[in-house]
């Protein structure tokens, strides 16, 4: 993790690291002379997705809509994603929605906060987690090995991410994802994410308020 300029500690808290990079054959192998640290304290807010969850459920066939959550860093995307996973996994009796098998791609350990194989956050009773693995590989492994109904993944944006999402969608798996951006226009400037937008992969897009953490700005249906 240090080579990616962060470490995740118990509880899903993340420490960003900058300093002098040690590079070998074009790859960062260490960071020396650390000059700054940025602490991001994880918090679970049970029920924070209740305001949007009904819009994400397809009650006609007891499934979920492919969803993208958009906001700048630090505005609550991961917190909302985590609670959506919990709701989808447990099921929502008032909506007549039975729980789904959810595969969580937790590359940086911020969603489930796994500790010795046990999630420290409540992510639901039907949830499988792969952590500390690059997102594309983890998505493919979950689809092949765990038969998820839904894949959840934080901070997508690379060409490899998009390829893995295409693979999951073609396998009949639904997806809940997050991406950095202030609005859809900003997201569409990412050439890879624009491909997913142009294909209309996302059936729901949630925009969070960039000025008030965790506050919903709008949902595109």
Regions found by a protein language model. Name each.
Residues 73-74:
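The conserved Walker
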Residues 80, 84:
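Hydrophobic positions on the alpha1 helix immediately C-terminal to the Walker A/P-loop
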Residues 67-69:
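Hydrophobic anchor at the beta1->P-loop junction of P-loop NTPases
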Residues 77:
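Conserved lysine of the Walker
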Residues 1-63:
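P-loop NTP-binding catalytic core
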Residues 146-206, 210:
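Conserved P-loop NTPase nucleotide-binding/switch module
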Residues 10, 24-33, 203-221:
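Conserved P-loop NTPase
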Residues 89-139:
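P-loop NTPase switch/communication element
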């Amino acid at each position: 993790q240090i080579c990616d300029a962060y470490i995740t500690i118990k509880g899903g808290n993340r420490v960003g690291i900058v300093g002098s990079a040690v590079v070998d054959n074009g790859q960062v192998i260490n960071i020396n002379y650390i000059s700054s640290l940025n602490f991001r304290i994880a918090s679970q807010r049970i029920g924070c997705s209740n305001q949007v969850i009904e819009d994400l459920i397809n009650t006609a066939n007891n499934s979920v809509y492919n969803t993208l959550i958009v906001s700048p860093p630090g505005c609550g995307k991961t917190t909302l994603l985590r609670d959506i996973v919990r709701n989808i996994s447990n099921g929502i009796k008032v909506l007549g929605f039975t729980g789904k098998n959810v595969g969580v791609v937790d590359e940086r350990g911020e969603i489930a906060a796994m500790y010795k194989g046990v999630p420290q956050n409540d992510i639901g009773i039907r949830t499988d987690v792969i952590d500390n693995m690059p997102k594309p590989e983890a998505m493919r492994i979950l689809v092949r090995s765990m038969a998820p109904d839904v894949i959840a993944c934080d901070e997508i944006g690379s060409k490899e991410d998009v390829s893995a999402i295409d693979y999951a969608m073609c396998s009949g798996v639904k997806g809940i994802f997050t991406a950095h951006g202030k609005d859809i226009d900003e997201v569409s400037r990412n050439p890879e994410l624009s491909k997913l937008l142009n294909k209309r992969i996302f059936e729901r897009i949630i925009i969070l308020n960039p000025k008030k953490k965790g506050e919903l700005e709008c949902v595109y249906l």
